[in-house]
A protein has these predicted regions:
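Membrane-interface "cap" regions at the ends of multi-pass membrane proteins
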Residues: 1-31, 60-65, 69-97, 250-254, ...
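Inter-helical loop and helix-membrane interface segments of multi-pass membrane transporters/permeases
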Residues: 4-8, 36-40, 70-98, 111-172, ...
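Loop-to-transmembrane helix boundary motifs in multi-pass membrane proteins
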Residues: 9, 15-17, 23, 153-154, ...
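Transmembrane helix-loop junctions in multi-pass membrane proteins
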Residues: 27-36, 40-43, 163-176, 195-208, ...
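Transmembrane helix-loop boundary segments of multi-pass membrane transporters
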Residues: 32-49, 68-74, 116, 174-182, ...
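C-terminal membrane-solvent junction of multi-pass transporters and transport-like membrane proteins
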Residues: 94-103, 337, 343-356, 376-434, ...
Length: 444
């Protein structure tokens, strides 16, 4: 069932794993996860979050990786080949356009955010960030000026130029190499930030809060919904990015093992962010009362600028954020690049150029509405893509195909629990993510 045509690929197991970690580690880990941990009671939130990471890492991630690898295709080809087992290839391919377009739309919105990050990293580098001091009016005005329509054209174009330059070098030569550098550096620097912040007066209050468990709080259904949503969206199960990276993975490697590592390190990145941000806010005497861009570009800037060594802390922090954003953006755009290569038979550089023009033009135009743009894509299209991938793989392709795809390259067959848990529980979770997100205005 796999394509026999020449296809780019990851050159090593850890290159693949680090790229998948890079795709998963993004803004949700940095500006949403610490806020949710703070808002929902530290360990009271973490316990259900860990349970959902275990569930999704043991089902959805494995399934999407295996779907991509077994078909050697992105979503369009993968969905088509799965549906072809029931004589409905054209229907499957048509459905496959949904996660492809969703990934492109999310990438376009995310480009604006990565452009903000590039600008703030440059400000941290030249001292402009620290020069704002702790004057909240100045800090807020700076961010509002950046996030408005046409307010960040230069840095948005720079961010996309770096992104597409990486992609032009291919999967092994560009994406893998970039992630092999950026991901280890990100973890090392975040750990260093955590160690430094632990030495600051008042940071201990933040740590105590993180590890506080309120059993009564576990009875709140909304806690479980938001913990589930954070795990679901953080692990990048959307029927696109994980499928495409899986299609570049060697048949000789174990998908269950790779999936466990991706889930583990994505969770570790989120925990490191929480262990940096929550104690930092405590040390600065600030309340973590808001998540999203405001946390990162306003409140943390204020806190860092009041710390000893704040200029260096801000620089290191925004470098970490830049790496997290860039590696996620590469993955999001890769889905549509592969689709052009596959459907229009374009050379990689030509496909990258086409998507670069589209991505740059649209992202420049939507800067003023990027928040609403991202909400529509993340609330509706991403969970729909995950649900469609789950249905096509676990329901349409069937048990024999699924187990053969998952077990290929593994040292031992996956347990009997995997197929029913994935088919019934995981697919139900994907449907829940779609419904709950629509009803609550987003859960991840």
């Amino acid at each position: 069932m796999s394509k026999q045509t020449e296809r780019d690929a990851f050159r090593s197991r850890w290159g693949f794993i680090l790229a998948c970690i890079g795709s998963a580690v993004g803004m949700g880990n940095i500006w949403r996860f610490p806020y949710l941990v703070s808002a929902w009671g530290g360990m009271t939130f973490l316990l259900p979050y860990f349970l959902f990471v275990l569930l999704i890492g043991s089902t959805g991630i494995i399934g999407e990786m295996a779907l991509g690898r077994s078909t050697r295709s992105g979503p369009i080809g993968a969905f088509g080949q799965a549906a072809a087992l029931r004589g409905r290839r054209s229907t499957g391919e048509a459905v496959g356009y949904i996660p492809v377009l969703g990934s492109l739309a999310l990438a376009i919105g995310y480009s604006c955010v990565v452009g903000w990050i590039f600008r703030y990293f440059a400000l941290a580098l030249d001292g402009g960030l620290f020069a704002m001091g702790q004057d909240m009016n100045v800090i807020v005005d700076r961010f509002n000026g950046t996030a408005c329509g046409w307010g960040n054209n230069f840095w948005l174009v720079i961010a996309l130029a770096v992104n597409f330059a990486i992609m032009a070098f291919g999967v092994g030569g560009g994406i893998e190499r970039a992630n092999k550098v950026m991901m280890p550096v990100l973890f090392f620097l975040f750990a260093g930030l955590g160690v430094y912040i632990a030495t600051l007066p008042g940071a201990g209050d933040g740590y105590r809060y993180i590890f506080t468990l309120d059993p009564v709080g576990l009875a709140d259904p909304k806690l479980w919904i938001y913990a589930f949503g954070q795990a679901f969206f953080s692990l990048s199960v959307a029927g696109n990015g994980t499928v495409i990276y899986g299609s570049y993975f060697s048949d000789d490697e174990s998908i269950p093992s790779a999936a466990r590592n991706v889930a583990l390190f994505d969770t570790l990145a989120a925990l490191l962010a929480a262990l940096v941000i929550i104690p930092a806010m405590a040390a600065g005497g600030a309340d973590l009362s808001d998540g999203g861009p405001g946390l990162m570009f306003i409140f943390l800037v204020n806190v860092f600028n009041g710390m000893p060594g704040g200029r260096v802390i801000g620089l290191v922090f925004f470098l970490c954020v830049l790496f997290a954003g860039l590696t996620s953006l590469v993955n999001l755009y890769e889905v549509s690049v592969e689709a052009l290569q596959d459907k229009l038979h374009l050379k990689r550089v030509a496909a990258v150029a086409v998507i670069a023009v589209i991505g740059t033009a649209v992202s420049l135009c939507i800067q003023a509405i990027v928040s609403d743009w991202m909400d529509v894509v993340s609330i509706y299209i991403c969970p729909l893509g995950a649900l469609l991938a789950g249905i096509l793989f676990f329901w349409v392709a069937g048990k024999d195909f699924v187990l053969a795809a998952v077990n290929k390259g593994a040292g031992k067959p996956i347990g009997a629990w995997f197929y029913p848990l994935s088919k019934y529980v995981y697919c139900a979770c994907a449907l829940l993510a779609l419904i709950a997100g629509a009803l609550l205005g987003g859960i991840g």
